[in-house]
């Protein structure tokens, strides 16, 4: 018996709906995505609530920065921590706002993928999707326990620790589910592309022009358009903001390790070992999100396979030739398919560059810390 289209994403979509985004009704049997008045009101109330809470946190951290100070950190580290939590609040608010503004575009995107997924019967990814989902939730629990212990040990006020945990916990849950949805949709598109690749290849091997080949190639063009245009419009700016936030937050763990532990603030062996482990785990959940968003570029590879096949198609002097040439020129030869709003490609090479940037950023922070220590030493004389 054929399974319902898009059934693999039920849990992810319901989680995002519970978080107040992508609030619409999905009929998995009829491949329909609808938004009604009550769902729109709920989405609006969620947005108002998130904007109000995040703005309140930003104002509170601005007027009472001393409440967020870590007693065992230096001035550079405390300034960096304030920048991080404010940036996290701003990015969360911006992404919530964008998802609300673009909700109709997401409706169209999901409905199109629903239809293609039902046609191709691509239902082989539920195990991988469940792995993505539960890995993210497991990392959320680890992240919160680690943050709670880390802030308590660092000397943060007990009344401020829940604020840190609420902001980072909610942001990691929300942003992580958006990244998981993007990764899952990317895998679904990959399965659909593989299906149409096989169909088009079978048509090519038949060595004859047919309506079936023209029809399948048109469908393939639509899938590429979804991958190249609609996915980038829906997720491009979101991933750009998420990447920037991760790039900002990730050095916090290693920087805390350098600025506290290696300066002898935790002298006992068990304290040193435990805080080293805490610092290592501090940035791990965010790095996993970065890898999940950019660790695979199989959609681009599958599209390139199609390009190689289409170059072997004999030219007939018909409109199909122009269609193939336009496809090769526009969609494959000029730029990558998946990008963060055109700023950079979402692939492994970009992932490596981002890790290099994170390391460079951490070195700069350490240099600021050393300058601060040198200034303090000079002032003593």
Curated annotation (Swiss-Prot):
InterPro entries according to UniProt = 7TM_chemorcpt
**What residue ranges lie in the Cytoplasmic compartment?**
1-43, 102-128, 194-234, 295-350
Which Pfam families does this entry report, sorted A to Z?
7tm_7 (PF08395)
Write down what this protein is called.
Answer: Gustatory and pheromone receptor 39a, isoform D
Q: Name one GO cellular component term.
A: axon
Q: What is its main location?
A: membrane
> Alphabetically, which GO biological process terms does the record hold?
chemosensory behavior; male courtship behavior; sensory perception of taste; signal transduction
Function comment: Gustatory receptor which mediates acceptance or avoidance behavior, depending on its substrates. Plays a role in sustaining courtship behavior in males, possibly through the reception of a stimulating arrestant pheromone.
Q: Which residues lie on this side of the membrane: Extracellular?
A: 65-78, 150-172, 256-273, 372-381
Which positions, given as ranges, span the membrane?
A: 44-64, 79-101, 129-149, 173-193, 235-255, 274-294, 351-371
Q: Name one GO molecular function term.
A: taste receptor activity
Null allele outcome, as annotated, is:
Leads to reduced courtship levels toward females.
Q: Spell out where the chain is glycosylated.
A: 74, 373
**Classification of source organism:** Eukaryota, Metazoa, Ecdysozoa, Arthropoda, Hexapoda
Topological relation to the membrane, as annotated: Multi-pass membrane protein
UniProt gene name: Gr39a
